[in-house]
């Protein structure tokens, strides 16, 4: 009897320890952040950070930054922003593209870098969730290696689950018009996530997410289309000669991505092409190609966020879970990731059929994902043109060019823009503001709500 009692007590203690462990690890956390190290005074906006667990046992903990709209959070749209990569932190969007703060561009001297307010934050008229995804990015993490191997389709499902749980804890935003946005590799993730949300709204999940549409900047969409557009783009921007371009077209027959290894003449021409373009900064061809350690280099600003985020006072202010403590990287390319969506064009087609609005925009000096390729896959959708190609203006100056289609898709270029919104943040903000408010970029007012 005594042994049975001891065994019972021992098992009870093990169960209690297990329950405590689960309680510590499976309770989602959220914290209101009133101030941040490096920023002078209280934050002039409402910031919340936290983790949402996804998976059967919430093995994956996704970290987010949530900023309420500065205009009317009760009614303004709610936007989920997904940074590209895959493997680039939400901080990239928040501090460099469309958030209310950015790094002050001072040379690092060993002290904590400073933050300053921006004038172009999309949170002026929308509430925004900046999400660290896929798992292993930023401060998101998995408790087991089994769940630390993300994929395109798997992340779309995780993001959908994240949204369901997040909205369950923030029910005051459940009726707000909801959008998903991103850039670069998010051209794969966002359309898949939109389709996953749409499918969930019809099949399983109540209350449904009030999904209205999505937006993408310089989106990676189809590796073949994107890759094959770089040579005609280079010719159009006078990066290669007419003679080289004509030879490439004739000898390679328009196929520059998957070249026949026996077509040695084509391979030699591609070497010549690379000689002409390899020294360019591909995210914006007018910017110099230089090292991140050089304070005069554009990308030096990225090193400042590395110093800032890895400071212990910043991690404490952001309420970072100790399980995810490690060296933070703005973009971590070393993580395993399965690219199981070859082309997101079918997802765009399905989302159009379901009636969702979309804004696709391209910085016209991006060599990574040239606007020519984006126009090719948009054309492949075979939707009628509603509004012809025309300039969109800011203060009577051309800010880019735009065209709209019968599937509620708007395409726009950003004049002087690069691979992400950060190269023309003011212009991109005005473009976003017009579109999210239901206006055509050139001024006509249109209905905002998706019709059922």
UniProtKB/Swiss-Prot annotation:
State the similarity comment.
Belongs to the peptidase S10 family.
The disulfide bridges present are 88-331, 252-266, 290-297
Q: Where is this protein localized, as stated in its record?
A: Secreted
Protein name (record) = Serine carboxypeptidase-like 6
Where does the signal peptide begin and end? 1-29
UniProt organism field: Arabidopsis thaliana
Output the superkingdom of the source species: Eukaryota
Q: Which residues are glycosylated?
A: 109, 125, 350
Report the gene name: SCPL6
List the GO terms this entry assigns under cellular component, sorted alphabetically: extracellular region
Q: What is the lineage of its organism?
A: Eukaryota, Viridiplantae, Streptophyta, Embryophyta, Tracheophyta
Molecular function per GO: serine-type carboxypeptidase activity
Class of the enzyme per the UniProt entry, highest EC level: hydrolase
Q: Which UniProt keywords apply?
A: Carboxypeptidase, Disulfide bond, Glycoprotein, Hydrolase, Protease, Secreted, Signal
Kindly list the biological process annotations in GO that this record carries. Answer: proteolysis
């Amino acid at each position: 009897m005594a042994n049975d009692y001891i065994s019972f007590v021992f098992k009870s203690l093990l169960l209690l320890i297990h329950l405590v462990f689960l309680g510590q690890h499976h309770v989602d956390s959220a914290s209101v952040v009133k101030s941040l190290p490096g920023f002078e005074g209280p934050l002039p906006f409402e910031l919340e950070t936290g983790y949402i667990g996804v998976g059967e046992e919430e093995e994956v903990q996704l970290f987010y930054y949530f900023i309420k709209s500065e205009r009317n959070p009760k009614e303004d749209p709610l936007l989920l922003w997904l940074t590209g990569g895959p493997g680039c932190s939400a901080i990239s969007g928040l501090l460099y593209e469309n958030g209310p703060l950015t790094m002050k561009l001072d040379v690092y001297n060993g002290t904590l870098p400073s933050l300053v307010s921006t004038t172009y934050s999309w949170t002026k008229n929308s509430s925004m969730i900046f999400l660290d995804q896929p798992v292993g990015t930023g401060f998101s993490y998995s408790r087991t290696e089994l769940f630390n191997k993300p994929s395109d389709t798997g992340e779309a499902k995780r993001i959908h689950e994240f949204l369901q749980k997040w909205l369950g804890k923030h029910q005051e935003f459940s009726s707000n018009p909801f959008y998903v946005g991103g850039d670069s590799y998010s051209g794969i993730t966002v359309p898949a996530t939109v389709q996953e949300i749409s499918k969930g709204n019809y099949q399983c999940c109540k209350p449904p997410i009030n999904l209205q549409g999505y937006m993408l900047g310089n989106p990676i969409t189809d590796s073949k289309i994107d890759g094959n557009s770089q040579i005609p783009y280079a010719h159009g921007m006078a990066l290669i000669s007419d003679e080289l371009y004509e030879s490439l077209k004739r000898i390679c027959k328009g196929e520059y991505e998957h070249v026949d290894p026996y077509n040695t003449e084509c391979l030699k021409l591609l070497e010549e092409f690379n000689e002409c373009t390899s020294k360019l900064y591909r995210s914006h061809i007018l910017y110099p190609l230089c090292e991140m350690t050089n304070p005069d280099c554009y990308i030096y600003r990225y090193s400042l966020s590395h110093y800032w985020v890895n400071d212990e006072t910043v991690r404490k202010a952001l309420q970072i879970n100790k399980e995810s403590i490690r060296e933070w990287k703005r973009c971590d390319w070393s993580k395993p990731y399965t690219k199981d969506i070859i082309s997101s064009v079918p997802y765009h087609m399905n989302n159009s059929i379901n009636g969702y609005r979309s804004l696709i925009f391209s910085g016209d000096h991006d060599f990574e994902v040239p606007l020519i390729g984006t126009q090719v896959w948009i054309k492949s959708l075979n939707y009628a043109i509603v509004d012809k190609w025309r300039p969109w203006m800011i203060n009577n100056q051309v800010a880019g060019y735009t065209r709209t289609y019968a599937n509620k898709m708007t395409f726009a270029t950003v004049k002087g823009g690069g691979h992400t919104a950060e190269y023309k943040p003011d212009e991109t903000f005005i473009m976003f503001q017009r579109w999210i408010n239901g206006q055509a970029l050139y001024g006509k007012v249109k209905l905002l709500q998706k019709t059922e």
